[in-house]
Curated annotation (Swiss-Prot):
It is an enzyme of class 2 (transferase). This is Phosphatidate cytidylyltransferase. One of its GO terms (cellular component) is plasma membrane. One of its GO terms (molecular function) is phosphatidate cytidylyltransferase activity. The keyword Kinase does not apply. Its main location: membrane. It catalyses: a 1,2-diacyl-sn-glycero-3-phosphate + CTP + H(+) = a CDP-1,2-diacyl-sn-glycerol + diphosphate. Belongs to the CDS family.
Amino acid sequence: MLKQRIITALVLLPIALGGFFLLEGAFFALFIGAVVSLGAWEWARLAGYEQQFGRVAYAATVAVLMVALYHLPQLAGAVLLLALVWWTLATVLVLTYPESVGYWGGRWRRLGMGLLILLPAWQGLVLLKQWPLANGLIIAVMVLVWGADIGAYFSGKAFGKRKLAPRVSPGKSWEGVYGGLAASLAITLAVGLYRGWSLGALLLALLGAALVVFVSIVGDLTESMFKRQSGIKDSSNLLPGHGGVLDRIDSLTAAIPVFAALLWAAGWGAP
């Protein structure tokens, strides 16, 4: 298993780095769209569609919608706002699982929820790539989320006692959340001090980082909730040793549109 994970990582890493940081404009949107389409193919299975026709049809639908959004940039703000609404709702659904299943258990509803997860993630990345310090922004959100993941892992291993959402993901603890949050805030503080941010800007950045990390946890738990309801361990086996695409990006699909929305609200990329 470890050998498989290493080989897969060595193959995918240069592709991912090249796609994220070397491609621009429509080529970048197409690259991210391909990744999101694979995620859509996996999501259709989480929604209850085992047959390839239904899964491919859903992925194609998501691809068409991404093309439409690319040609309708005036809708970007609405897409980010929709993401904020969705992740607020998703928090409630996770906290009330399994009682909440009655509201989202149907296949069509789950397909619709997939759109609310996948399309804003694509839109957020496309916007970040268009804004000042584009690659730096993409690195920033990834470092925030991955730094929080690392902090949560070690903190949870060392101190984890109180379960965060035992009916959704029994392995996660509140102590892990605190460790992840502390790691992300430490990263943000270090960057702010290095770049000489004002006290006001630093406080806003710390608040924003905390919100992004919280939402990334909700994103992770949301996919876990859908997998648990479907009786599925991994979203697919597309990435040997790593599971599926969604298993690798579940936290980022939530964090990216919220990160972009916060920057938009701060006037970073608004026209």
